[in-house]
Amino acid sequence: MPSEKTFKQRRTFEQRVEDVRLIREQHPTKIPVIIERYKGEKQLPVLDKTKFLVPDHVNMSELIKIIRRRLQLNANQAFFLLVNGHSMVSVSTPISEVYESEKDEDGFLYMVYASQETFGMKLSV
């Protein structure tokens, strides 16, 4: 069972900065993304991992399809993705643009997902 602690709670700021430095050094065309289930989410499963290296040319709709597939959701199940705790992002936006505008000070791009429009904003496919 995955930990109830968030990625930021499990790794120190210094560890996260070093993780990003190594990732960007070894994979310069990949975006380091942390995707976690919204803390109040009950219907959607927890992902088997939280850290993803997303090719920088991928757009948000492709990323959503990948996450939906990993969660094994059917077409009728609602799925909303929130970037950096507050942002609604167009599904046609490349992940590289989202990363540049929304990355955390540690260098990761953080996202949470839920089955409802819990956030007041939504990104759905």
From Swiss-Prot:
SUPFAM superfamilies: Ubiquitin-like
Sample GO molecular function, one term: microtubule binding
Expression sites (tissue/organ): Most abundant in heart, brain, skeletal muscle and testis. Little expression observed in liver.
PTM characteristics: The precursor molecule is cleaved by ATG4 (ATG4A, ATG4B, ATG4C or ATG4D) to expose the glycine at the C-terminus and form the cytosolic form, LC3-I. The processed form is then activated by APG7L/ATG7, transferred to ATG3 and conjugated to phosphatidylethanolamine (PE) phospholipid to form the membrane-bound form, LC3-II. During non-canonical autophagy, the processed form is conjugated to phosphatidylserine (PS) phospholipid. ATG4 proteins also mediate the delipidation of PE-conjugated forms.
Propiece residue ranges: 121-125
Entry keyword Iron: no
Lipid bilayer topology: Lipid-anchor
Site, as annotated: Cleavage: 120-121
Keywords: Autophagy, Cytoplasm, Cytoplasmic vesicle, Cytoskeleton, Lipoprotein, Membrane, Microtubule, Mitochondrion, Phosphoprotein, Ubl conjugation, Ubl conjugation pathway
Subunit and interaction comment: 3 different light chains, LC1 (a cleavage product of MAP1B), LC2 (a cleavage product of MAP1A) and LC3 (produced by one of the MAP1LC3 genes), can associate with the MAP1A or MAP1B heavy chains. Interacts at microtubules with CABP1 (via EF-hands 1 and 2) but not with calmodulin. Interacts with FYCO1 (via C-terminus). Interacts with TP53INP1 and TP53INP2. Interacts with TBC1D25. Directly interacts with SQSTM1; this interaction leads to MAP1LC3B recruitment to inclusion bodies containing polyubiquitinated protein aggregates and to inclusion body degradation by autophagy. (Microbial infection) Interacts with Hantaan hantavirus glycoprotein N; this interaction contributes to the virus-induced degradation of mitochondria by autophagy, which leads to degradation of host MAVS and inhibition of type I interferon (IFN) responses.
UniProt family annotation: Belongs to the ATG8 family.
Identification of the protein by name: Microtubule-associated protein 1 light chain 3 beta
Protein encoded by which gene: MAP1LC3B
